[in-house]
A protein has these predicted regions:
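Helix-coil boundary and interhelical linker segments in multi-pass alpha-helical membrane proteins
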Residues: 51-63, 101-112, 251-254, 354, ...
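Helix-loop-helix hairpins and the membrane-proximal interhelical loops
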Residues: 2-62, 175-177, 208-292, 433-437
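Membrane-embedded alpha-helical modules
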Residues: 106-216, 220, 334-445
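Helix-loop-helix junctions within the multi-pass membrane cores of secondary transporters/permeases
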Residues: 11-45, 49, 70, 91-149, ...
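Loop-to-helix transition at the N-terminal end of transmembrane alpha-helices
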Residues: 56-76
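Juxtamembrane transmembrane-helix boundary signature
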Residues: 2-3, 71-92
Length: 445
């Protein structure tokens, strides 16, 4: 009995030394509960990400495993290196940009697309190492940051509606309503409403519940074939290490690479600041302890993610659900990472999820991201016009890159045209000029 108590005390002592639980006013039990809570809110990514990257021609079974691995790697590294209750996983939005635009619309091999993700992540890593990253966040106006986030939300929402069959291509009107009497369309819409209703009732696993319910209903209707629950992890050799670094390192993909870098910069940095602020760790300027370590983990996770065959990795805002139940240290993130490793053995379940079951999650994420438009000052046209252009041009041009480019250019035009030059930061002007050069010398040829 005394040996058991000694072992338990030793384990608690190690956790205290690594995570400083008492200093953060928490306990191991609270951190574990917080880890489970965060995991339940974001585990949907292991079902949705393979569906999206499968559009690019990637092996969905292999992507399922690499999604679990990179989520585990990033989350555990964040917990141990930065001691923050923030989990990481492949970014929603950038995965859709990669699959639907870079590969499908631009016609590039997915290996080249992964190369673009890699170079964007390397750029982000360099910005982090040389401390330029936080300077960019501080100097790019809220209207453009919100426009980018909301535009990606509209883009994801459109992809969700398309995958559910709610909207279909129409040569006369571009898009039109699909067959709303089709059971797959109805199940896709049902999945979205399940998420919306459960989330409004503060049920953390709303997305997971929706995917399970719609998949079960699909199975009852014959769309889904039962392949078991537990199995050895599928091989990942078809996706790991197939990144085309040489083919993607060219001027023609500069805009795509920059888009991956810029979006990941805003997405992850904003999430880190938001979650740490909710945990009471950030100061009034948005700075938090071990910020440099957290930004480094975020960057290196994206570099690693491209090599193992998954899209850009980012900090997940769902981490705030774990914070809401008491998560304050990196132990929360480590628990999330361990749970992602365990999920690897549930690959048959991931293979059963039909596209319309994942569509509801896409639409819901679109809603969450688009809601940030409320932060725009709509009374000031020099701020609202660029935000609007940035947001709507992403789905309408079917390109996140073009939306970002036009947003920065319009921002400069509006400020110069109204004589408000003091509102222009060097960062915004430089980015806008780079996009103008891209349009004139690259896109025009």
């Amino acid at each position: 009995m005394s040996q058991q108590h000694t072992t338990q005390a030793s384990g608690q002592g190690m956790l205290e030394r690594v995570f400083k639980l008492r200093e953060h006013g928490t306990t191991a039990r609270t951190e574990v509960i917080a880890g489970f809570t965060t995991f339940l809110t974001m585990v949907y990514i292991v079902f949705v990400n393979p569906q999206i990257l499968g559009v690019a021609g990637m092996d969905t079974s292999a992507v399922f495993v690499t999604t679990c691995l990179i989520a585990a790697f990033g989350s555990i590294l964040m917990g141990l290196f930065a001691n923050l209750p923030v989990a990481l996983a492949p970014a929603m939005g950038l995965n859709a940009f990669f699959a639907f635009v870079v590969v499908q619309a631009m016609g590039l091999p997915w290996q080249v697309g992964m190369g673009a993700i890699f170079w964007g992540a390397v750029g982000l890593l360099l910005l982090t190492i040389f401390r330029v990253r936080y300077w960019m966040i501080a100097n790019i106006p809220v209207s453009l940051r919100v426009g980018i986030t909301s535009g990606i939300g509209l883009f994801i929402g459109m992809m969700g509606l398309k995958n559910a069959g709610v909207i279909v291509a129409n040569p006369e009107t571009l898009v039109s309503i699909g067959n709303l009497t089709s059971h797959s369309v109805l199940l896709g819409v049902l999945g979205f409403f399940i998420i919306a209703i459960l989330a409004s009732r503060n049920i953390h696993a709303a997305v997971l519940v929706s995917i399970i319910v719609t998949t079960l209903l699909g199975w009852m209707m014959g769309d889904v074939h039962y392949n078991g629950i537990v199995s050895a992890p599928p091989s990942v050799t078809s996706v790991v290490g197939h990144v085309d670094l040489a083919g993607s390192f060219n001027l023609g993909l500069a805009g795509v690479i920059f888009s991956f870098m810029l979006v990941n910069l805003f997405d992850s940095s904003g999430t880190l600041i938001g979650v740490t602020d909710k945990a009471g760790l950030a100061d009034e300027k948005g700075k938090f302890p071990r910020m440099k370590q957290a930004l480094f983990v975020d960057s290196i996770s994206s570099v690693t993610g491209a090599f193992v065959g998954t899209s850009s990795v980012t900090a997940y805002i769902e981490s705030s659900s774990g914070v809401s139940v008491g998560g304050r240290t990196g132990l929360t993130a480590v628990v999330v990472g361990i749970l992602f490793l365990l999920v690897i053995f549930l690959s048959p379940l991931a293979g059963m999820v039909p596209p319309y079951a994942a569509a509801g999650a896409l639409i819901y994420v679109g809603v969450l991201m688009t809601s940030s438009l409320a932060r725009v000052n709509w009374q000031d046209l020099t701020e609202s016009v660029p935000a609007f252009i940035t947001a709507v041009m992403m789905p309408f041009s079917f390109s996140i890159t073009e939306g970002i480019a036009l947003g920065f250019i319009f921002y400069c035009v509006m400020k110069i045209g109204t004589g408000r030059l003091r509102d222009l930061s060097p960062c915004v002007v430089i980015v806008a000029l780079l996009f103008v050069l891209k349009i004139v010398f690259i896109d025009a040829h």
